[in-house]
């Protein structure tokens, strides 16, 4: 009877219970548990997601500020490099969220040298790629400001953050990046990749790179007709 539940199942139930209180914003209870066991922030559920990750996922900035005050130096207690079963870190989840202030809080606390901005998951996806896929312009610019490399490629498809922004149809992000970095879009998304998308996924991307003659969505800053431009596809892929 003393081993009614496996230890890993008990751990998962406990983290699930803590996760529920994080979602509900019960900071007082969390503070009591933290005083008893500070390493509670690194305990994980069955998916490998730590308590610190769930604080980031639920966007509890009050929890984050409490944790940061408890450390003598960044990373003393919090293992912000911990990854779940898919290889995602807390930064991967923060990069996908709309509230970029939480991402700025974490990046500002751990600093440029205190966290691995370009840490990929098991598919080679970095946080800046996740931000590009979701169209989180402010998140992507914050990550780049703290040292993220937007030209790094994932393992399976060989796409950079620039490629994902174009492929997923995030027009505002594409325009913002092109305006900020003044690079022709054809450098980010070569035409040959369109054929790769078609063969692999049996569908066309939402944005394609086309000539600057007809149905042009937007011209590049240089206004050079020899440059390639962005054209938005309709539902028929034209």
From Swiss-Prot:
Q: Where is this motif: Nuclear localization signal?
A: 80-86, 202-213
> Where does motif PxIxITxC motif map?
205-212
Annotated membrane-spanning segments are none
Which superkingdom? Answer: Viruses
Q: Which SMART domains match?
A: ANK
Start-end of the ANK repeats?
Answer: 48-80, 87-118, 124-153, 158-187
Gene3D superfamilies assigned to the protein according to its UniProt record, in alphabetical order? Ankyrin repeat-containing domain (1.25.40.20)
Q: What is its main location?
A: host cell
Q: Does the keyword Transmembrane helix apply?
A: no
Q: Which Pfam families match?
A: Ank_2
Q: What are the recorded Gene Ontology BP terms? A: regulation of gene expression; symbiont-mediated suppression of host NF-kappaB cascade
Q: How is it modified after translation?
A: The protein exists in a 28 kDa and a 32 kDa form, probably due to post-translational modifications which are neither phosphorylation, nor sumoylation.
State the UniProt keywords alphabetically.
ANK repeat, Early protein, Host cytoplasm, Host nucleus, Host-virus interaction, Inhibition of host NF-kappa-B by virus, Repeat, Ubl conjugation
User: Where is this gene product found?
Assistant: Host nucleus; Host cytoplasm
Which PROSITE patterns does this UniProt record tie to the protein? ANK_REP_REGION, ANK_REPEAT
Instruction: Pinpoint motif FLCV motif by residue range.
Output: 227-230
One CC-aspect GO term: host cell cytoplasm
Induction (UniProt)? Expressed in the early phase of the viral replicative cycle.
| Stated role | IkB-like protein that inhibits the binding of NF-kappa-B to DNA, thereby downregulating pro-inflammatory cytokine production. Forms a heterodimer with the NF-kappa-B subunit RELA/p65 and prevents the activation of the NF-kappa-B transcription factor. Inhibits calcineurin function, which is required for the induction of nuclear factor of activated T cells (NFAT)-dependent immune response genes. Prevents the binding of substrates to calcineurin without affecting the phosphatase activity.
- Subunit (UniProt): Interacts with host PPIA. Interacts with host PPP3CA/Calcineurin. Interacts with host RELA/p65; interaction of the 32 kDa form with host RELA results in the formation of a stable complex with NF-kappa-B. Interacts with host PPP3R1. Interacts with host EP300; this interaction inhibits the association of host EP300 with host RELA, JUN and NFATC2.
Recorded hits in PANTHER family, A to Z, give: ANKYRIN REPEAT FAMILY A (PTHR24124), CHROMOSOME UNDETERMINED SCAFFOLD_25, WHOLE GENOME SHOTGUN SEQUENCE (PTHR24124:SF14)
Protein family (similarity comment): Belongs to the asfivirus A238L family.
Q: What is known of its domains?
A: The C-terminal region contains the docking motifs PxIxITxC and FLCV, which are required and sufficient for binding to host calcineurin.
Name of protein? IkB-like protein
Q: Which organism encodes this protein?
A: African swine fever virus (isolate Tick/South Africa/Pretoriuskop Pr4/1996) (ASFV)
Recorded name of the encoding gene: A238L
